[in-house]
Amino acid sequence: MEDAVTMDTAFEDKPLVVAGRTFTSRLIIGTGKYKTYAQNAQALEASGAEMITVAIRRVNLSNPDEPRLVDFISPDDYTFLPNTAGCFTGEDAVRTLRLAREAGGWNLVKLEVLSDPKHLYPDMAETLRAAELLIKDGFDVMVYCSDDPVYARKLEEIGCCAIMPLGAPIGSGLGIQNPVNIRLIIEQTKVPVIVDAGVGTASDATVAMELGCDGVLMNTAIAEAKDPIRMARAMRHAVIAGRESYLAGRMPKKRYADPSSPLSGLI
């Protein structure tokens, strides 16, 4: 029994902590592109996620005459993460999040300032400027950014509570396109690093976690799957598998074969 307890302890992992908030799930999902809020709620439950992004400019939170997200997903049960999807200037992003705080009292927010509607890459100069304003205003800022280690360091230095580099363009489903840069960001960063955007299927989520990311955020990969609920469940297992694999440490790659059964002592 003592050996079993020791083994269980060895397999334990530290929880994800963002701005003093603790999460057991390392998967974050969104609220866009689902057919209904009911489907979104089912996917959320299947995913095991505890945090869900909310596009303040697009999601109905308050109008009782139309379907409301809060009628299906309660902020008492999940951490709502207001984001600035659709904002193309720092001023617009700051204004949106200030309105979100007035409406729901949210201080933990996700900042994204986009550049071009075609590729939705972040405008890093505007992102940095907006992040500084929000942090001075008392927000805990999780920030969507490029996979540039230099900008990632600057965002951490000004006080962002999580760095969220893209794996590929938003909604592209291309998977992790620049694992080298993602790894560089992980190695230099003390706050959580969460891949945001580009995940297309479960194996992409596993790759992100095997690189050493603290979490993965996704929306389209689940919402546009043929079976969103099943894909949400797949993503749940993929994130866990990737994290376990990272903690276990993979075997070294070798140029030549190495037999599984020792050759010594053969009859």
Swiss-Prot record:
Can you tell me which residues form the catalytic site?
110
Recorded hits in Gene3D superfamilies, A to Z, give:
Aldolase class I
Reaction(s) catalysed by this chain, per the record, are:
[ThiS sulfur-carrier protein]-C-terminal-Gly-aminoethanethioate + 2-iminoacetate + 1-deoxy-D-xylulose 5-phosphate = [ThiS sulfur-carrier protein]-C-terminal Gly-Gly + 2-[(2R,5Z)-2-carboxy-4-methylthiazol-5(2H)-ylidene]ethyl phosphate + 2 H2O + H(+)
> What are the GO cellular component annotations?
cytoplasm
Record's keyword terms, sorted: Cytoplasm, Schiff base, Thiamine biosynthesis, Transferase
Name the major location: cytoplasm
> Would I find Transferase among this entry's keywords?
yes
Name a Pfam family for this protein: ThiG
Annotated localization: Cytoplasm
Annotated binding of 1-deoxy-D-xylulose 5-phosphate, by residue: 171, 197-198, 219-220
- GO BP, sorted A to Z: thiamine diphosphate biosynthetic process
Question: Self-association or partners: how does it assemble?
Answer: Homotetramer. Forms heterodimers with either ThiH or ThiS.
Q: What does this protein do?
A: Catalyzes the rearrangement of 1-deoxy-D-xylulose 5-phosphate (DXP) to produce the thiazole phosphate moiety of thiamine. Sulfur is provided by the thiocarboxylate moiety of the carrier protein ThiS. In vitro, sulfur can be provided by H(2)S.
Could you identify this protein by its name? Thiazole synthase
Which gene codes for it?
thiG
